Amino acid sequence: MQYLSPIEAVGLVKSGDTIVVQGSTSIPMVLLCALTERSSELRDVKVISGFGIHPEEAPYAKRELMDSFRALNIFVPNNLRRAMREGIADTIPCFLGEVPFLFRSGQVPVDVAFLNVSEPDENGYCSYGISADIAFSGAECAKTVIAQVNKYMPRTFGDPVIHVSQIAAICRGDEPLIEVPTPVPSEIETRIGNFIANEIPDGATLQIGVGGIPNAVINALSNHQHLGLHTEAITDGVLPLIEKGIIDNSLKKIYPGKSLGSLVLGSKHLYEYMDNNPDFVIRDVAFTNDPQNIRQNPKAMAINSAIEVDLTGQICADSIGETIISGVGGQHDFMYGAALSEGGKCFIALPSMTSKGQSKIVANLAPGAGVVTTRFQAQYIATEHGIVYLRNLPLAERAKALISIADPSVREDLERAAVKRFGIGFLRLK
């Protein structure tokens, strides 16, 4: 195996190519910066990224480089939000679990995959480490795989291995992995977390996201037993439950005894904890996010967030009005899978108000807002004022339930909107 310089490695990229880039906290920035250095030689290169976190903006997503590179996202990484606002980048609306199908079916042809992998083992296998998500299927379908080998990348079990013979060009890219601090839940988030935790039974299998509310839920599960983890993102928050044996994965049907995820977001401690740890399995999103796999786990619990919820139960989670700030991600995949699970439950958790004092329970979604979870899938909605169950409720009764967990300062306005929309049907409920 011969190591090339980064600029030599990306020399295999041609004009018109489509590149799939590994994400999570292991974006191969060495390769992307080298690619950008070739901008004068390249035209119409599409760069597709999934969820990712990096403090530096994507180097290829600049106005002056638009003839060379087109930035496309499945889920808008934090370092491409400015480019999205300015129209430099665009998004492909897609359920995350279906992205590998788009690659494998050829609907989105993949020419090149950029990876950030571990050192090869004695048999020549590199690990994708903390991010299989869309990278595994991207590399599987790519005509050319280019990788930066990173001494900081842990080795994980599951999908994430690739032999050096499958990699066309390799360079060194010893970048410390991005760390994501564990947020301390606020008082409001703690109240929301308690409402949700009270609905989670012993023996449940958890899909839980990232942020203050998910950590508040985790903190409230300290007296539970025999929980399982089948999720998209594994975070530091679950480690105390694993170390105490509260998450033991003993009742799961999919990978019993093991915690399953598709990517990892956390601290150096978490990355080191997972290194060569057979208690964790990392699979690509075609597996982790498949509702037919999720439903096999008993009491599957899908816990997700939202930007706003309207009075019929439509849930916006990817945009603020017309401005897309994230993506569908795995919310639909897990909400649907949990709904099909025996004893499963789906939760949407959000504060009742924004930091600017605007209600998140609204009469109608903002113009241009995307519906990530439809009113037909909505089950439990929780704010700091309570939790309500919407499934099978008629629209007027849904409105009444949602108003009850809105901030008290906006309830009268929401009631007037409900009367205007539902008429006597709403009035008869009072």
Regions inferred by a protein language model and the residue ranges of each:
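Conserved alpha/beta enzyme-core scaffold
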Residues: 1-430
